[in-house]
């Protein structure tokens, strides 16, 4: 308990200082700590900072910092949330997207450099039927390399949205399995990343 003024002036228990692929730096207990992470995406890193804060608050003086950081570093990505699969020696990253803020953060979290990119958009009930939110996503980060494959029920709507941001879509198909195979065959030696809605991900 405390006054509103006291609550407003309370220093953050955990501060996320920086992050990049495979590592985040947090400031807590008056020092900066670099933590190797299996999680990807800034939204997952925010969740990691929240988990550190909650655990320290609940456990108070009883928490073991070494054990806590090791446990955090061993957390695996949830299905499709930055999950990485290996195929023929190359990674395929699955990035679930379901709203404009999530898609924007995903694009910010996963730089397109050196990656072949595919986007799979369905509008089934579990995805949400209204895909107009794609208009609120900035796809300019994909402009330089373009998108290798666009697929899903709303493939042509997605391709049109990319065109508005001057992002080239090399191939467009509503047939997800066929599009996936073409994507893999066309980029055998490249790491790959697929942004997908929920039911599109289940088809991959």
Q: Model-found features: residue ranges?
A:
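Adenine nucleotide phosphate-binding catalytic loops in nucleotide-utilizing enzymes
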Residues: 1-100
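Residue-level signal for inorganic ion chemistry
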Residues: 47, 51, 148, 194
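Short, charged, surface-exposed secondary-structure boundary motifs
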Residues: 16, 128-129, 180-184
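Alpha-helical scaffold segments in soluble metabolic enzymes
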Residues: 50-53, 57, 105, 109, ...
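Glycine-rich phosphate-binding loop signature in dinucleotide/nucleotide-binding domains
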Residues: 58, 110-115, 183-191
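A glycine-rich beta-strand to alpha-helix segment
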Residues: 178-204
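Gly/Ser/Thr-rich loops at beta-strand to alpha-helix junctions
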Residues: 43-44, 98-99, 154-156, 198-202
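Active-site beta-alpha connecting loops in nucleotide-dependent enzymes
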Residues: 78, 90-91, 96-174
